[in-house]
């Protein structure tokens, strides 16, 4: 079990607190993962639907004895006071046929409503925005919150990057942890992949494919410890 992180502020050590705004599938999953990883001593779920936030928090908290001793609870914006990190996931979900930009105005309006309330109680927190369209919402949050840019992070193309590595892992039958590839740009239709930066265990994709053809590999399965040394002649 990982040790709960300790922070140093005003001469004393204290345990960390993370608030998640939005108790939908994304917010609840993030809160659950935070509990499993043991990265916070207190996790607060905040949602306009208080009953849903309470239910999700209880489900997560009841699983805590098997993972970490973190406190998981629901609350209001004032309960986010003292948070080290605030994750914003609220907003409407994308429906079939909608682009991320179609969500822009609705989710911008939602963000405008919650920003003054959360910033009032957690002005020193690091804010991580996950809601779509994430690039636009991160920009809007920066403008209306009045917080320094160093306190604001957008999830960007991390999900796109994760999906890319999954696809490459599936294609080459190589463990994802040995694949290094990235998606750049916005989280949307204009993102792109710099293939020249992609590699598998230090080999470019072109080099890896040539190696597989040259060696006549007969067995390279997905395995947690797989490296190129397992390529057989």
Can you describe what each PLM-predicted range is?
Residues 42, 46-83, 98:
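Conserved N-terminal Rossmann-fold NAD(P) cofactor-binding segment
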């Amino acid at each position: 079990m990982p040790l709960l992180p300790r922070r140093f502020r005003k001469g004393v050590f204290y345990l960390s607190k993370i608030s998640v705004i939005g108790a939908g599938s994304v917010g609840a999953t993030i809160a659950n993962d935070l509990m499993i990883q043991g990265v916070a001593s207190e996790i607060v779920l905040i949602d306009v639907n208080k009953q849903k936030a309470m239910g999700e928090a209880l489900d997560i908290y009841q699983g805590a004895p098997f993972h970490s001793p973190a406190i998981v609870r629901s609350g209001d914006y004032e309960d986010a006071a003292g948070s080290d990190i605030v994750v914003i996931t609220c907003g409407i979900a994308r429906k079939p046929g909608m682009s991320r930009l179609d969500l822009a105005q609705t989710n911008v309006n939602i963000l405008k409503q919650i920003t003054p309330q959360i910033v009032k109680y957690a002005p020193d927190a690091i804010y991580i925005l996950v809601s779509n369209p994430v690039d636009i919402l991160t920009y809007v949050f920066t403008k209306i919150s009045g917080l320094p840019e160093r306190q604001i992070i957008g999830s960007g193309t991390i999900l796109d990057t994760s999906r890319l590595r999954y696809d490459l892992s599936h294609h080459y039958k190589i463990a994802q942890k040995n694949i290094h590839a990235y998606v750049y740009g916005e989280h949307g239709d204009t993102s792109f992949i710099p293939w020249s930066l992609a590699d598998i265990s230090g080999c470019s994709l072109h080099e890896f494919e040539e190696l597989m053809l040259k060696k006549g590999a007969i067995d390279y399965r997905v395995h947690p410890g797989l490296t190129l040394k397992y390529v057989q002649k």
